[in-house]
UniProtKB/Swiss-Prot annotation:
Its cofactor is Mg(2+). It comes from the Bacteria. This is Putative hydrolase Bamb_4846. Its EC number is 3.-.-.-. Keywords: Hydrolase, Magnesium, Metal-binding. Pfam families: FAA_hydrolase (PF01557). The lineage of its organism: Bacteria, Pseudomonadati, Pseudomonadota, Betaproteobacteria, Burkholderiales. Mg(2+) binds at residues 124, 126, 155. PANTHER family: FUMARYLACETOACETATE HYDROLASE DOMAIN-CONTAINING PROTEIN 2A, FUMARYLACETOACETATE HYDROLASE DOMAIN-CONTAINING PROTEIN 2A-RELATED. One of its GO terms (molecular function) is hydrolase activity.
């Protein structure tokens, strides 16, 4: 299934794509794509519904983040060896874990706000993993059983706040609008191997990032198992799994960063695309 949330910010309704790619309203069956609705049992109930019997959503509504009430938004850094190289950092021996504040979450086509005074706002196309079942201390072999599905994430980052000012990465990762998620939550049964997905990103039509999840340092299963040893993962938690090379700060000889008035387009095979315009934060 391709599940989504549509409508004005803060008033999103749950939906599903039908066989023709049209949005159908799910709100008579589930209040939101959050919590227990993301469990195996919850998704099984949704899967039993024929989308053709659901109300058709007219027009072109705003698409919100594909998951509601996200409890934890967990980032993984330097998870592609060639990205670590372009960043001038060693390939990690353990996952680099940081937090993205849930207040950064927005829809896949909402605008990106360039923070006041920022000259180093950067892009990162990433595979997002949405937890469906509570898990703690799970084995790698069973880790994917706890996943509800997958989505596209743009891990927007302000490099001065992330790196140059010292301290933790979190503060450069969590500005408002720095977490576009979606458009769809694609359930795990439709993604047989999350380590075989092409992902890409363009700015103003120029392709900067081209990668495949097979080159991750730590696989999705390894990340879920690892994170479950140091925290309880809960339904609706989102793990954004790192980015391939081609970020702005790694461009030689001179880094390239986002400015107001630009267009960012990114996607992952089978998971949909995002399209964002950049603007100065007010």
């Amino acid at each position: 299934m391709k599940l989504l949330r549509y409508g004005p910010s803060g008033q999103e309704k749950p939906g599903i794509l039908d066989a023709n790619g049209r949005i159908r309203d799910l709100s008579a069956h589930v209040p939101d794509l959050a919590g227990d609705a993301l469990s195996d049992a919850g998704l099984t109930r949704l899967r039993a519904i024929d989308p053709a019997t659901l109300p058709l959503v007219s027009g072109e509504p705003r698409i919100g983040a594909c998951v509601g009430r996200v409890g934890k938004f967990i980032g993984i850094g330097l998870n592609y060896a060639d990205h670590a190289a372009e960043a001038g950092m060693p390939v990690p021996k353990e996952p680099v874990v940081f937090g993205k504040w849930t207040s950064s979450i927005c829809g896949p086509n909402d605008g990106i706000d360039i923070p006041k005074g920022s000259v180093k706002t950067d892009w990162e196309v990433e595979l997002g993993v949405v937890i469906g079942t509570t898990c703690k201390d799970v084995d790698e072999a069973r880790a994917l059983d706890y996943v509800a599905g997958y989505c596209v994430v743009n891990d927007v980052s302000e490099r001065e706040w992330q790196i140059e000012r010292g301290g933790q990465w979190d503060k450069g990762k969590g500005f408002d609008t720095f977490g576009p998620i979606g458009p769809w939550l694609v359930t795990r049964d439709e993604v047989p191997d999350p380590q075989r997905l092409d992902l890409w990103l363009e700015v103003d039509g120029h392709r900067y990032q081209n990668g495949n999840t097979r080159t991750m340092v730590f696989t999705v299963a390894q990340l879920v198992a690892y994170l479950s040893t140091c925290m309880t993962l809960q339904p609706g938690d989102v793990i954004t799994t790192g980015t391939p090379p081609g970020v702005g700060m790694g461009i030689k000889p001179s880094p390239v960063f986002l400015k107001a008035g630009q267009t960012v387009r990114l996607g992952i095979d089978g998971l949909g695309e995002q399209l964002q315009s950049t603007r100065n934060a007010r």
